[in-house]
Regions:
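An acidic/histidine-cluster motif and surrounding catalytic segment
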Residues: 1-112, 116-241
Length: 241
């Protein structure tokens, strides 16, 4: 019997671009359509595939309950001067948090951002996910990431390679960016409790601050998903990952 894995796809409401210029919004939506098409191809292989739509956030940016309020930038100009917390960062945090809080009765939850695609066949990609689940489960894993791994500044992993290599996988201290990752059911209560008792931040930084070196986290040796080039509503710039 296959484990019951839920995939939650975080998507932006295509009909509500707010004040984002049309050419930039068109870029975001083209990436989103490609991502939806890719994940709908594997949806029937999992216990649940859910699409969670949000309106792109251009209004809410609370300083209360923020882990680092001094870097909040309320400018609505489309510029990015890190370190910064923008409307886009808060919108993404809320979306990831909602997905985690709505984990449900599953063996694992996979959270996928709106622009993520994969190059494998749908069958191969599905198998990689189930293999990763079994690998992590056997090693008391809390989380598993399928994307490219980088590390937060000032972490020990950013100074030297702290990964433990195991064939097709590696154990890591933490991971940025968090665009396609799995949370095991054993971690559900803990991460929901952390969310209830900590301030908000850019989602991958929140994960880094709350999880660095604390629990077993794994990744595929090489990323099996990526985000295509195009406009980002979080970083306000073109990105290739």
């Amino acid at each position: 019997v296959r484990p019951r894995i839920k995939i939650c796809h975080l998507l932006l409401d295509p009909n509500q671009p707010q004040d984002i210029p049309k050419d930039k919004w068109d870029s975001v939506m083209a990436k989103q359509r490609a991502s939806v098409s890719a994940f709908e191809k594997i949806s029937s292989n999992f216990a649940c595939y859910s699409q969670m739509y949000s309106v792109v956030n251009r209004t809410e940016l609370p300083s209360e309950n923020c882990a680092q309020p001094e870097i909040i930038d309320r400018s609505k100009d489309f510029i990015n001067n890190p370190p910064v917390l923008s409307y886009g960062h808060y919108g993404a945090y809320v979306a990831h948090r909602s997905a985690v809080e709505d984990f449900g009765n599953y063996d694992a939850l996979i959270v996928v951002e709106s622009d993520v695609v994969y190059d494998l066949s749908p069958e191969e990609f599905t198998q990689k996910i189930y293999d990763a689940y079994e690998f992590g489960l056997a090693r008391s894993g809390a989380m598993f990431t399928f994307g490219a791994v980088s590390y937060g500044t000032a972490s020990r992993a950013s100074v030297s390679d702290t990964a433990i290599y195991m064939g097709d996988y590696k154990q890591i201290d933490h991971f940025l960016c968090a665009h396609c990752y799995m949370i095991f059911e054993s971690e559900k209560e803990s991460i929901q409790s952390k969310l209830a008792n900590s301030g908000w931040h850019a989602w991958d930084i929140w994960l880094y601050w709350n999880y660095d070196t604390r629990v077993p986290i794994f990744s595929t040796l090489e990323p099996i998903v990526h985000e295509p080039e195009g406009y980002s509503v979080i970083d306000y710039q073109k990105k290739i990952l």
